[in-house]
Amino acid sequence: MLANPFVGMPAASAEPCPDVEVVFARGTFEPPGVGGTGQAFVDALQSRLGGKSMEVYPVNYPASLDFQTAANGVIDASNKVQSVAATCPDTKIVLGGFSQGAAVAGYLTADSVPAGYQMPAGLTGPMPADVADHVAAVALFGKPSTGFLQMIANTAPPITVGHLYADKTQDLCIPEDPICSPAGSDSNAHNLYPANGLTDRAAQFVADKLESTTATETAG
């Protein structure tokens, strides 16, 4: 079964605390790290942060064709997010993912257990609601559509961004990309998010969310 939006126990976080922590899950078959789309996004975001410090955490999971192992990514990402929220409460967290990694990040934001789905081992329930206060923005690139998920993993639940994250999520899909768009028919389009400016668009969206969050806290 594909990963579900449930979490394990938080792990320890290193000090000192950065201003911004990006937690990004790479796409299928990309080598460990954040992947090509992730790196383009991270670089574009860094250039928009001025003097703010930023750390990047590549989600640790197989990113293989076995979508059941995406659960490993949900567990790893949720552990990291909860750890940062607990030990670095002033750090603004940015979630992101490309392709299968966008599924991982999307499931992480879900409100509840999808009806009829069994939780994989190591997942205990949705992330605590107060964790969402520490997440400034979410950037999803080429998130698998429900139809695509059913084609490759028919036990996979649909990916629904939870209400606590919806207003701070940018979900980007190239219309020709068949992974995320039911009408898409050009498989090459799936790898064009950096080339067509969508990683820059997402970086600006996230930078604006980070700025507005900081301004709101300062005013408060």
Regions found by a protein language model. Give the residues of each.
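Structural motif
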Residues: 21, 136-139, 169-170
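Hydrophobic alpha-helical membrane segments, chiefly transmembrane helices and signal peptide h-regions
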Residues: 3-6, 107, 200-203
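Active-site-adjacent alpha-helix of alpha/beta-hydrolase-fold enzymes
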Residues: 43-47, 152-168, 172-174
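Secretory targeting and sorting signals
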Residues: 1-14
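Serine-dependent carboxylesterase/thioesterase catalytic core
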Residues: 74-163
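Active-site catalytic motif of lipid deacylating hydrolases and related acyltransferases
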Residues: 16-92, 172-199, 203, 208-217
